[in-house]
């Protein structure tokens, strides 16, 4: 696999980064989660995503909200929301890795703020479903590239 650079050029001594490439999760769900956790503290984002996995709190869907039901108790002034469990588990894994990276570099893991979170569509994996009468139908498995940068705040 090719080495993929970060899309942002943020430099500094008080940063920690983490990324995951070609995850088999929904691109729309991962984009909504990235928009939601941006500018939050890492521990707050981890707690909220754990509640999403437990189906206690929903992620507000701001972009991909056509035919999405209203959910009660969404933060901000949003109505539509869902519980993207699989994508939330992937984000939890990346945020835990970032906390360990920050601890290794000597940052305080209690005061980390997410300053950059992005999710982009990755490479599409193409395959075929065998069908009746010797036919085949194409299927495309979408992948996602996620990158998160955190900064230690005072």
Swiss-Prot record:
Pfam family, one: Ribosomal_L22
Xref: CDD domains: Ribosomal_L22 (cd00336)
InterPro entries: Ribosomal_uL22, Ribosomal_uL22_CS, Ribosomal_uL22_euk/arc, Ribosomal_uL22_sf
One GO molecular-function entry: rRNA binding
An example Gene Ontology CC term for this record: cytosolic large ribosomal subunit
Keywords: Ribonucleoprotein, Ribosomal protein, RNA-binding, rRNA-binding
GO biological process, one term: cytoplasmic translation
Keyword RNA-binding: yes
Gene3D superfamilies linked: Ribosomal protein L22/L17
Tagged with keyword RNA-binding: yes
Sequence similarity: Belongs to the universal ribosomal protein uL22 family.
Functional summary from the UniProt entry: This protein binds specifically to 23S rRNA. It makes multiple contacts with different domains of the 23S rRNA in the assembled 50S subunit and ribosome.
Subunit organization: Part of the 50S ribosomal subunit.
Protein name as catalogued: Large ribosomal subunit protein uL22
Primary gene name: rpl22
